[in-house]
Amino acid sequence: MKFKNSFYLPSGRVFLLETDDGYPVECTEMRDVSVQGKQHYEVRNTQDPHIIWKHLKSYEEKWLLTVSTQKGCVHNCKFCDVADLKFKGNLSKSEILQQVNFLLSSTPYVQESAKVKIGFARMGEPAHNLKNVLGAMFSLFEFDRKFNWLPCFNTILPRKTTEGLSGEDVLKKVIDFKEDVYKGFLHLQISCNSTDEQKRKELFGGADVLSIKEIVNYINNYSSPITQRTVTLNFIVMKGVPIDVDYLMELGLNPERFAVKLIPLNNTVQSQENNLVTLANYSNYEDLEALRDKFKQHKIPVVIDAIAKCEEAGLCCGQLAHIFV
């Protein structure tokens, strides 16, 4: 792969690479931001990058990477700008690792880190490229850096993949890999976004995905222990899109096997064209906290992931490819 362009943000960089057959592929490297108390409020609402810089965690403490797994994406999610890019198939294991190598080569000053969280879903649905994605995760140990890798498998969990696997097959393979290879230190995140299955299907552009009920039943009844990292259900919070905490509890959401992540809807071209509006972001963060507290009443671990106001443009998947292609 060759370098095409880059976009700089206060906390890191978005890179646009190009495959040998000329397809644009995004990857990113970011530092995490402190989210404690008053600092969190200050960072969240600022348009001054200097304030962001003051609150960045060190590379030695935590580093955030993402790589793409497909040339575009087979799905047409209504909030994601990758949907507008023509789909050209899976990236090979080598092409995925070339992105990792590029990110490391671009940051030679980062030689060790207690946690390198690397997401395999910048562009593409990794469930459709499972063999190459897991192969790339396995090969992370070959890079000559003192890193504690924490790979992240982010998926909408299609009912049937293009490789012929069922959604349950994908869950089993990823969880077994998580436990056998990474001793539990792999983060499995499943995009949910609503507890209304019809609304979920609409948001995923008509994709046939496993229902939340099926996911909860499968994970709750998984025969082997799920250690170190529980399975995370991701919800992008949007106005008019229901997230029924009581319904999730009725399904048997088990705090020993599940966590929840609440994410504001980012400002994308697709979300604007489809009239999707975030329920909460940096300007009314208390609404996000109110939803979080409903989960916490049931002892469900909850993470809120809100970006700063000055970082919104250019951060989302597919946006750099649209600008320069």
Where are each of the predicted segments found?
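Auxiliary Fe-S-binding modules of radical SAM enzymes
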Residues: 1-25, 31-44, 217-325
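N-terminal pre-triad scaffold of radical SAM enzymes
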Residues: 15, 22-83, 93, 109-122
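Core AdoMet radical
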Residues: 61-65, 81-218, 222-226, 230-238, ...
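Short, electropositive, low-hydrophobicity segments enriched in small/polar residues
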Residues: 76, 126-128, 322
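A residue-level signal for conserved active-site and pocket-lining positions in enzyme catalytic cores
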Residues: 73, 153, 317
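Short linear Ser/Thr-Pro motifs
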Residues: 6-8, 68-69, 155
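Short acidic/His/Gly/Ser-rich catalytic and metal-binding motifs that mark active-site loops
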Residues: 75-77, 197-198, 269-272
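Short, small-residue-rich loop/turn micro-motifs
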Residues: 71-73, 192-194, 264-266
